[in-house]
């Protein structure tokens, strides 16, 4: 009898395939949810990922778990961007660039977040908010230490400003308005006039 730990077999490749299938499902879901909203067809997502519906449901038993995975993936991307910006030469420009990315994230993910809030445990929302606030805090503190951001500004102030802009401009016809409003908010963030 061969011990279990030395048995040859395709166990590792299957786990690798399963991981790739999950990644493809999240990638496809991200695209389909962006195009069609959180109520998009799960069959369309499976088809775009190149897997069957059974594979989708083995990985994500319901729509909410798939929505949560997509939201976490998007937040990972947003927070990873903040981490990379921590090494940028200009703390001021790094903060502004990340806030622009956060505004885009908030505008694109409104329906996704709203759908999750209806059915998903509160802990997901709290975790997402904490991660975004931590990313904002790291960039804000760096700008404050360099003297380009107001010292009395809290990370939650920035997060609320950006979310407010995203909510206020959800149905505007002027596509440039969210960016203009963010630039006005950025002017209020700075302790001194920003370089052009």
Question: Model-found features: residue ranges?
Answer:
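C-terminal peripheral helix-coil segments that are non-catalytic and often amphipathic
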Residues: 1-9, 134-149, 171-196
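Short, hydrophobic secondary-structure boundary micro-motifs
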Residues: 41, 111-117, 148, 152-153, ...
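Short hydrophobic/aromatic patch on the recognition helix
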Residues: 50-60
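Alpha-helical DNA-contacting segments of helix-turn-helix folds
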Residues: 60, 67-74
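Short secondary-structure transition hinges
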Residues: 65, 97, 103-138, 164-171
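All-alpha amphipathic helical-bundle segments outside canonical DNA-binding/catalytic cores
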Residues: 124-128, 145-160, 172-177
């Amino acid at each position: 009898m061969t011990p279990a730990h030395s048995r040859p077999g395709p166990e590792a490749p299957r786990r690798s395939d399963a991981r790739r299938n999950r990644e493809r499902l999240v990638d496809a879901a991200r695209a389909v949810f962006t195009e069609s909203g959180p109520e998009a067809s799960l069959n369309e997502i499976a088809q775009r990922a190149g897997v069957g519906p059974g594979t989708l449901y083995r990985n994500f038993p319901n729509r909410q778990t798939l929505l949560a995975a997509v939201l976490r993936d998007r937040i990972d991307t947003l927070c990873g961007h903040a981490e990379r910006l921590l090494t940028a030469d200009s703390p001021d420009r790094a903060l502004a660039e990340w806030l622009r990315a956060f505004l885009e994230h908030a505008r694109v993910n409104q329906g996704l977040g709203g759908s999750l809030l209806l059915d998903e445990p509160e802990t997901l929302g709290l975790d997402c908010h904490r991660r975004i606030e931590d990313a904002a805090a790291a960039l804000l503190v760096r700008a404050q230490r360099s003297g380009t951001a107001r010292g009395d500004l809290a990370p939650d102030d920035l997060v609320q400003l950006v979310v407010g802009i995203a909510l206020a401009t959800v149905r505007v016809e002027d596509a440039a308005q969210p960016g203009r409003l963010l630039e006005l908010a950025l002017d209020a963030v700075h302790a001194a006039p920003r370089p052009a």
